[in-house]
Each structure stands twice: as C-alpha cells, then as structure tokens.
Curated annotation (Swiss-Prot):
Pfam families cross-referenced by the UniProt entry: tRNA-synt_His (PF13393)
Superkingdom: Bacteria
Record's protein name: ATP phosphoribosyltransferase regulatory subunit
HAMAP family: HisZ (MF_00125)
Gene from which this protein is expressed: hisZ
Compartments where located: Cytoplasm
GO terms for biological process, alphabetical: histidyl-tRNA aminoacylation; L-histidine biosynthetic process
Family to which this protein belongs: Belongs to the class-II aminoacyl-tRNA synthetase family. HisZ subfamily.
MF GO annotations: histidine-tRNA ligase activity
GO annotations of cellular component type: cytoplasm
Assembly: Heteromultimer composed of HisG and HisZ subunits.
Amino acid sequence: MPLINLPEFATELLSEFDARNAERIDTPVIQPAEPFLDIAGEDLRRRIFMTESETGASLCLRPEFTIPVCLRHIETATGTPKRYAYLGEVFRQRRDGANEFYQAGIEDLGDINIPSADARAIGDATGILARLLPGRRLSVTLGDQAVFEAVVQALGLPLGWQKRLIHAFGNMTQLEALLAGLVSPQFVTGLDDDIARLIASGDEQALIAHIEQEMQATGYSTNASRSPLEIARRLKEKLILSETRLDDAAFHVLEEFLSLHVPLVNASAALAGFADAAGLKLGNALSRFNGRVGALADAGVDLSCLDYRAAFGRPLDYYTGLVFEVTVEGSSAVLAGGGRFDRLLTFLGAMDRIPAVGFSFWLDRIETERAAA
C-alpha cells in the first residue's frame, strides 16, 4: 500500500466513524517520547523511531494514536464523555511489512457506564469490519487484565510479585519465566556484607545512610542516578522477592486460570467455577466481567464469534481491564485490537480520573483481506 495515498476504503471508514458520533481528531506526527517510553510497554518501546529537539528534548515519530489522542484531549480541556476518531500514519520498526503504515480507530473517553462502553467498542470494531469485509466471518479473542489482577491479589503474593506478574500479563513467555522463579526462587547473592546485615536488621534509615556514604565515597551523584532511599527500597524488595516461594497449590491455581479458554457465552460460569474450586473471591472483577457479557448481548453483538482466553493480553502497559483482538476466522492476522485504559489519562496529566476504552484498525491488513476476496 503506497503510503502517499490513503486506502481506497478510507472514505467509507470515515463515514462509519461519523455514523457512530466520533469526532475526527488530528495529532502531530512528532510526539514527546517520554509518555511512550514510560507506559507504552516494552514491545512498542523497542520499535519506536527516536529523535530529539534542538534543546535536547526526546521526541519520537508517532508510534500509535491512543496516547496522542489523550494528550490532545487534556490540552484542549474538553469535557467528557467524548468520542474521538482518527486515521493517519504511525511509525514502528517492524520485522515484516513497512515501517510506516496507516491506522484508524475510535477512543471513547469519559463514559462512566463501563460495561456499555466496553460492549460498544467491541460492537463498533466488529460492525465496521463486517461492512469493510462483507461475507467474512470474524473471530474475537477477549481477555481481562482486571480478572487476572484479582486472581493474583487473592493468592496473597507480595505486592512486588503482583506487580511483576501483572506487568507480564499477555506475554506468556515472560509470565512462565516469572512463575518458574516463584516455584524455584533464585536467592540474591553477592550483596555487600554490611548491606546484607542492614537489610536483615530492618533498619531502613541506617541502610540509607550507609548507601549514601558509599555513593559519596565512590563519586556517584544522586542527581544522575537513583537516590539512596530508592536504592535501599529496591534492594529490600529484591531480597523479599527472591525469598518468596509460590507453593504447589497456588501455582496450580494460576496454571488452571491461565489455561481457561472458552466461548464467551460460557466464560462467566467457567470463571465462577474456577473461583469456587480455588476458594478465591474475585469480587468486583467478576461482576464487571459478567456485566460486560450482558451488555454485549443487549447491544446485539454476535456472541458466537467471541472467545474468552484468560491468558490473553495485549503488549501495551496502559491497559487495565478489557483487551480484545479481531481476526478473520481461520487467519492469524490481527485486523483490530483494543481495550480499556482507565488510568492512562490521569498518568498523562488529567486532573480527574477519566474512564476510557478504544480500538484501532490495521488498515494494511484490512486491505490485504479485501484484495483476497
């Protein structure tokens, strides 16, 4: 697809956005790099094209649209709820395909009816694809990071391990490596004797003072590196994590959860059965999941094409709940993907918490599917 031209179905796509009351928004191609480096996820970070301004500020070519759309919303102090639509180029280093390609999508900001907004995102993504690819049967894979977080929390793991596991959600290779480390801990070795003694004593102030003294003696600047307090707390956390072992029963509970893969119509019962058998209370996460399934049915979405996979996530760190991807049945090419990102706008500087959900289309892949028809 020549990048100097829009896809031939672009006008039809924009009409679909208009019909869904989504306002077209443009964002600069050159973006501040920091938000992407901080919260976009490791998979995207290593694909970003970096540059810098004359003053040395880190910049990048726009690698995706969600963060730029949210930044523009905050800058313009626009009220919510608000639906934005976008269509434009993004720039990523890719093993296959062009490094610059078109994406389009909708970001739905500020709707406090979470189940309804989630259902609308999935319904819009599948509905638009059905118009662009008539006669194709679509397949939707759905996951929920909030349910995974509830399972990890209910197992009573130390907070540091919870954060690590949640951060790895959706990356089974990384998740399996972390679980292996929990089953067979690798104890921290090579600690300075004085530091090991101070950590064992629990005297944080003495540990901080010792680290500060060592930094001064070796010429480390606290302005150019972590502070003594940060170093002390990271060392303590590392030691605690290295000494934490996941017992066999808890390990098998996590394995059982991650193996769940059922049609969405059966997912609520499967999750309830899992929680009862494991003796876990999943509380609000399960209630929200069930509410979303009900909202999808109420919105007329064809539930027969939706599967729930407990281990499914997307490689962007800002997702907080629903995640989903859409393919043509029998194909592995992801045509649309999205999810819920309720913490993102606050992280980017919004004064109030703004619930948000959205999705994006991969237009080059849609064009390939249309050409194959």
